[in-house]
A protein has these predicted regions:
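Short alpha-helical "recognition helix" segments of helix-turn-helix
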Residues: 29-31
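Short glycine/serine/threonine/alanine-rich loop segments
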Residues: 25, 36, 65-68
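Short, basic-rich loop-to-helix N-cap that marks the start of a DNA-contacting helix
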Residues: 47-61
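Recognition helix of helix-turn-helix/homeodomain-like DNA-binding domains
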Residues: 34-51
């Protein structure tokens, strides 16, 4: 029996740290660029919170704006992985509430089960 190991999913905070390093910005400089406080930036980097849709867009835009053409694909890939990590984290933290909302909205428990 072949067992394939799945890589451990990357955390949004780790990917944001890589983005910050590649942009060569301090925590304070990056928080200023994004219009958030240093405390919020540290919480994002520590994976304590996930960014809102608007902040997520601002981070990705800041990261992929004006890249060197030879690293554009790398930056797009990392931005995509960061977005996926945020989505996984959001789902992991809110799956029960999402499940309840689906049940309430659709009144079909079998739909709720298929989402999990």
């Amino acid at each position: 029996m072949n067992v394939t190991s799945h890589p451990v999913p990357e955390e949004a905070g780790e990917l944001l740290t890589r983005i910050q390093r590649e942009l060569n910005l301090s925590t304070k400089a990056m928080s200023n660029q994004l219009g958030i406080t240093d405390v919020w930036m540290r919480r994002l980097l520590n994976n304590d919170i996930i960014p809102s849709q608007h902040l997520l867009k601002a981070i990705v835009t800041l990261y992929v704006r004006h890249p060197d053409p030879c690293i554009l694909n790398h930056r797009r890939d990392l931005a995509h992985r960061f977005t996926q990590a945020c989505a996984r984290t959001y789902y992991a933290r809110n799956h029960h509430r999402l499940q309840q909302r689906c049940h309430t909205l659709f009144h079909f428990p079998e739909l709720t089960v298929s989402l999990i």
